[in-house]
Design a protein with these regions (language model features):
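Jelly-roll (double-stranded beta-helix
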Residues: 1-358
Length: 358
């Protein structure tokens, strides 16, 4: 059912044309998400709206730091979100990240366009492309590497995706590492009542439609595309927080119809319904409003965050550093270069400059 809007082979490096999203041949055949019952719906208002700064990650690929400037208390159970790339690389340009450690959380890498390879010290890994998701539970500790395949480095091509960090409760931070390979064809698809919005449910549940991702932390992750003038209202669990990130386009969010545009994050207040609408006029490069909608049950525990480690206390962070330096987080091939461990600990707050590689 899932198809590309245009073939990768037809793209020329560095052309200023839209980066296509995953779509379907006929949205009218998809199940519809019903309009919320007005007698019970409580529309969430927008608590804050921030604009993501741009930076470089890993070996130099561009990112937008979607959560920058937002208090971790509003993000809980999430820690970090990067919009990666949205570029059409020339030959030799694609970049990745070298081998590096993680402990205490999960990384969720969602590829919209392009191809990324993953390998880890637990034997997990694979290649994700065009709507695929890799869900890596670092848990007690793991080493991994993420990079474009060699053929993409040689030829150049599209690269656009997201990486989300999902915190783990203290009781599950020591769970064994695992890897989930979620293909685009497994993602639950639905539409708005009028067919103007395509909803892809990667994890969690929306109106009975369940995504394939298996999560330790109760949460929902959705990628939605709204055509110009379309409106989408989603039922949203009242015990979850709610965030909307605009990856492309212009629209409004929340009960007060607050304007939102590319690179902005809306944090919602309490309620059980999220409302988003696309402006009728969109830019040629972004003909639709593309958004990530995410939320989960707050963990409500202290957070100590240093680079690639997310724990509950400073002592646990120091132990993670020691375990990494001693080789207790796994082994990698001798030819691979390992980054230096970072040196700044952030406790229950937003990370400082010099954030970790993914």
């Amino acid at each position: 059912m899932v198809e590309r809007v245009e073939a990768l082979a037809d793209r020329k490096p560095n052309e200023d044309r839209p980066v296509p999203a995953i779509t379907v041949p006929d949205i009218t055949v998809l199940p519809r998400i019903p309009e919320p019952d007005p007698t019970v719906a409580r529309m969430r208002a927008v608590r804050s709206l921030t604009t993501a700064p741009s930076g470089l990650e890993g070996e130099g690929f561009p990112v937008r730091r979607a959560f920058a400037g937002v208090d971790l208390g509003d993000l809980d159970p999430f820690v970090h979100l990067d919009q990666m790339g949205e570029v059409d690389y020339a030959p030799g340009e694609p970049k990745g990240t070298p081998w590096h450690p993680h402990r205490g959380f999960e990384t969720v890498t969602y590829m919209i366009d392009g191809t990324f390879e993953h390998s880890d010290s637990n034997g997990g890994g694979g290649v994700i492309t065009n709507g695929d998701t890799q869900w890596m539970t670092a848990g007690a500790g793991i080493l991994h590497i993420e990079k474009p395949p060699e053929w993409l480095v040689v030829s150049g091509g599209l690269f656009h995706g997201f990486q989300l960090w999902v915190n783990l409760p203290a009781a599950q931070k020591w769970t064994p590492p695992r890897y989930q390979d979620l293909r685009a064809t497994e993602v639950a698809l639905a539409s708005s009542p009028d067919g103007g919005a395509l909803v892809r449910i990667i994890a969690g549940e929306v109106s009975g439609h369940k995504g394939p991702g298996s999560t330790y932390t109760p949460m929902t992750l959705v990628h939605a595309t709204l055509s110009p003038g379309a409106r989408l209202s989603l039922p949203w669990r009242a015990d979850y927080n709610a965030l909307v990130y605009a990856m492309a386009g212009h629209g409004t969010v929340g009960s007060e119809a607050r304007p939102i545009q590319t690179g902005q994050l809306a944090v919602f207040g309490p309620g059980n319904t999220i409302t988003v609408a696309a402006q009728q006029a969109q830019e040629s490069r972004s003909p639709n409003l593309d958004i990530l909608i995410l939320g989960g049950r707050p963990i409500g525990e202290p957070v100590a965050w240093m680079g690639p480690f997310v724990m509950n206390t400073r002592e646990e962070i120091m132990q993670a550093m020691a375990d990494y330096q001693a080789g207790r987080l796994g082994t990698i091939p001798a030819i691979a270069a390992v980054h230096n461990a970072p040196t700044t600990i952030v406790e229950t707050g937003q990370p400082r400059d010099g954030e970790p590689a993914h």
